[in-house]
Amino acid sequence: MRALAVIYAALLYGFIFLPVVVLILYSFQATSFPIPPFTGPSLRWYGAVISDGRLTAGLVNSVMVALASSAASVLLGFLAAWGFARFRLPGEAWLRALITVPLTVSYLIIGMGLLVMFNAIGMPKSLWAAGIGHVVINLPLCFAIVYSQMGDHQMIIERAARDLGAAEWQVVLLITAPMLWPALFAAFFLSMTFSWDEFVISWLLTRFDTTLPVEIWNLMRSGLNPKTNAVGALVFGVSILLAILFELVALRRRPA
């Protein structure tokens, strides 16, 4: 039975990571075609990526959009979760459901709706528009994560802080937020991950300044290009580093 479990785990992880391994392997291809046989290793295409102005600009744009939209999503999600947890609102179950609806809607539908709305109000395609779109898709996730961690014990501590003379903004900023730090960090990390490689909304809402996934798409439209493998390997490496950072922070905050 143990051997079957090991075989099953090996097949599962192989199925998940084999495409990534192949992508990383052929990112070191020396020739101009990312197909067998493998000839290398060579850093030729990594150098080509670094020297490609559009790819590096797309990378910077992706980082800026991911950071800004994730921060906004966490802030708005935290405030919404705090409001629902501390106040009784008419029809609050329906209101909570409405906040989480975007989690079940296709990004294509959300992107098209935002595109129509922005055209109606005269807002041009830009990184700002893409950032707003990323907030729309990430805010429900942040809200769900933070709201699930709010409990009665926090209300008791908040009430004690008010009894000691703390203002409401001090209670929220100095009491509630620190207690929810693990949830806030997890929400920010997941939001960053989703925003980092999101393509559909970025493609619909940007024009001249685009994000890295859109630039990769534009690169692939002209045919097979080893630079796409190098970019994919770099993006995967960044994602792994973020995951390791998240685990290290979680381990440091975990009680002994």
Predicted regions and their residues:
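Transmembrane alpha-helix signature in integral membrane proteins
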Residues: 28, 53-86
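Membrane-interfacial helix termini and adjacent extracytoplasmic/periplasmic loops
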Residues: 34-38, 43, 91-92, 108-138, ...
